[in-house]
Structure formats: C-alpha cells, structure tokens
From Swiss-Prot:
<feature type="binding site">
    <location>
        <begin position="76"/>
        <end position="77"/>
    </location>
    <ligand>
        <name>substrate</name>
    </ligand>
</feature>
<dbReference type="GO" id="GO:0008837">
    <property type="term" value="F:diaminopimelate epimerase activity"/>
</dbReference>
<keyword id="KW-0457">Lysine biosynthesis</keyword>
<feature type="binding site">
    <location>
        <begin position="220"/>
        <end position="221"/>
    </location>
    <ligand>
        <name>substrate</name>
    </ligand>
</feature>
<dbReference type="InterPro" id="IPR001653">
    <property type="entry name" value="DAP_epimerase_DapF"/>
</dbReference>
<dbReference type="Pfam" id="PF01678">
    <property type="entry name" value="DAP_epimerase"/>
</dbReference>
<comment type="subunit">
    <text>Homodimer.</text>
</comment>
<feature type="active site" description="Proton donor">
    <location>
        <position position="75"/>
    </location>
</feature>
<feature type="binding site">
    <location>
        <begin position="210"/>
        <end position="211"/>
    </location>
    <ligand>
        <name>substrate</name>
    </ligand>
</feature>
<feature type="active site" description="Proton acceptor">
    <location>
        <position position="219"/>
    </location>
</feature>
<feature type="binding site">
    <location>
        <position position="66"/>
    </location>
    <ligand>
        <name>substrate</name>
    </ligand>
</feature>
<feature type="site" description="Could be important to modulate the pK values of the two catalytic cysteine residues">
    <location>
        <position position="161"/>
    </location>
</feature>
<dbReference type="GO" id="GO:0009089">
    <property type="term" value="P:lysine biosynthetic process via diaminopimelate"/>
</dbReference>
<dbReference type="InterPro" id="IPR018510">
    <property type="entry name" value="DAP_epimerase_AS"/>
</dbReference>
<keyword id="KW-0413">Isomerase</keyword>
<keyword id="KW-0963">Cytoplasm</keyword>
<comment type="pathway">
    <text>Amino-acid biosynthesis; L-lysine biosynthesis via DAP pathway; DL-2,6-diaminopimelate from LL-2,6-diaminopimelate: step 1/1.</text>
</comment>
Length: 276
C-alpha cells in the first residue's frame, strides 16, 4: 500500500512524518529499518507518527521509532517538527498543542517567527525513574568502561540520558565511548549519551550519541538533559544556548520540579509517497 509522508528536520536531525489520522497503516520494525535506509529507503533518524489521542486532555498522540525499528519515549527535535506538521497540514488551529507521548503530555507552541517552543516537562532525576542503577540520587555518578572510570550525570527527559562533561567536544570519543555507555548495564533500557563542553555559563557545545541511531546532528532531549546536568553541577545558568553540529537550541530550566523549555527550528523538506 502507498503511504503519504513528509520529510522534515530539526537542525539536521531528520524525520519521516506520517499522518495516521487521515490514513491507516501499521509499521513493523523491519519496515521501519527498510524505510530508514539512506541508500534503499527514504532515509531518516526517526519515524514520527501522528495519531488520534488516547486521552481527553491531549490533541494528538505522538509516537517515535528509531532507525533500528525500536519505539522510543521522546524526541525533542521531532516534537518541533510534529508541531509544524499538524499546523501546516491543518490538523489543528491551536497555538498551544497538547501531545500525548509514552511518558506523558508535552506542550508545543508554534511562534510567529516560525520557531517552535516545547515544554518538555520536568526532568526525572531519581535513578529508578531514568532508569539508572544507583542506590541514591546524585548529580554525578562514577561509571566504569573497560577499566576506566568516568563521571556521568543521569537524567530522564522522558527518555534516559547520560551526560559527560568534556574539555573539547571535537576531540571527545563520541562513537566508541558513546556506544559503550549506551549499552552499559547501569542503563537497563539503554541511554542517549551526551558529551558537553561548557564554554561559559550561558553557552555550551554538545554532541550526542543517540540510543538506536548513533551520533546525530542534533538531539533536542539531549540538549535539555545536558543543561539539566550542567545546572546540577553548578556549571550553567538557567538560560543556555546549546551549539550542536546541526545548529543551535535555546534551553531554559529554573530548577528541580520545573519544566525544561526548548526553542528551535523545524523545517519541512518535501512531501512524498512510499509503498510499505
């Protein structure tokens, strides 16, 4: 069957977006992997699905599948693209859009300048909520990889993140160490791994090795988790600009119990049809 889709990106983190309100389909993991292939398929980091909400306080249901076919809880860059998609496709005329994810409700705001602000909700820091194997909640945890000890912060932004502070993101072993930490036994559900370089209290650089996708040009939840980790370590102010390989995001966080706010672009690349 033929399915209509839209190719979008947020800072180079690219998505295939499918409206399953006006059309019907079911994506099996092997189909997602085939579509994600950049040589033989559409090519994307994640597949984003727009569905009717399953609860009365939401406007839509938002589902995310990684390129390896696994379904994940959250994607910040995808959320911005989701907001622009439902507005431009006239699926809603609301300015503030409430979206149901696997880990709860997030709120999306399409600004007049075309940027999208996402209320990502409050970060979860208790080890059991991330999940991360630790006896008590700390800002920094020692973690061993191949006999070497590292210091990591563990944060959930609806999906699990580990954040390391590095001197230079360009020299950080993102692929080797990122893969090892993604699959570390202390992250039972695997994790996205961020490498954070603090330039000054309101500006930082970040590279992210995403769970199930590898390093991407940008990771919205990773940027949020990095600011939370930086704030918990006393390195960052409440409003920070994060420079990722694909561009910049503005992140703000007042502190524990408060939501993380993320603002950045969402770009529509093209519309197409594909047979599944």
């Amino acid at each position: 069957m033929l399915i209509k889709f839209t190719k979008m990106h947020g800072l180079g983190n690219d998505f295939m977006v499918v409206d399953l309100i006006s059309q019907h389909a079911h994506f099996r993991p092997e189909q997602v992997r085939r579509l994600a292939d950049r040589n033989f398929g559409v090519g994307f980091d994640q597949l984003l699905i727009v569905e009717p909400p399953g609860r009365p306080d939401a406007d839509f249901r938002y589902r995310i599948f990684n390129a390896d076919g696994s379904e994940v809880e959250q994607c910040g860059n995808g959320a911005r693209c989701f907001a622009r998609f439902v507005k431009e496709n006239r699926l809603t005329n609301k300015k503030n859009i409430r979206v149901e994810t696997k880990k709860g409700i997030i709120e999306l705001i399409v600004n007049k300048d075309g940027l999208v602000t996402v209320d990502m909700g409050a970060p979860r820091l208790a080890p059991a909520d991330i999940p991360f194997v630790a006896e008590t909640q700390e800002a920094i945890y020692p973690i061993e990889v191949n006999g070497v000890m590292y210091e990591i912060s563990a944060v959930s932004m609806g999906n699990p993140h580990g954040v390391l502070v590095v001197d230079d993101v360009n020299k950080a072993p993102v692929h080797k160490l990122g893969k090892a930490l993604e699959n570390h036994p202390r992250f039972p559900e695997r994790a996205n791994i961020g490498f954070l370089q603090v330039v000054h209290r309101r500006f930082a650089k970040l590279r992210v090795f995403e769970r199930g996708a590898g390093e991407t040009l940008a990771c919205g939840t990773g940027a949020c988790a990095a600011v939370v980790a930086g704030r918990l370590r006393g390195l960052l102010d409440r409003k920070v600009e994060i420079k990722l390989p694909g561009g910049n995001l503005k992140i703000s966080w007042e502190g524990e119990g408060h939501p993380v706010m993320m603002t950045g672009p969402a770009v529509r690349v093209f519309d197409g049809q594909v047979r599944i």
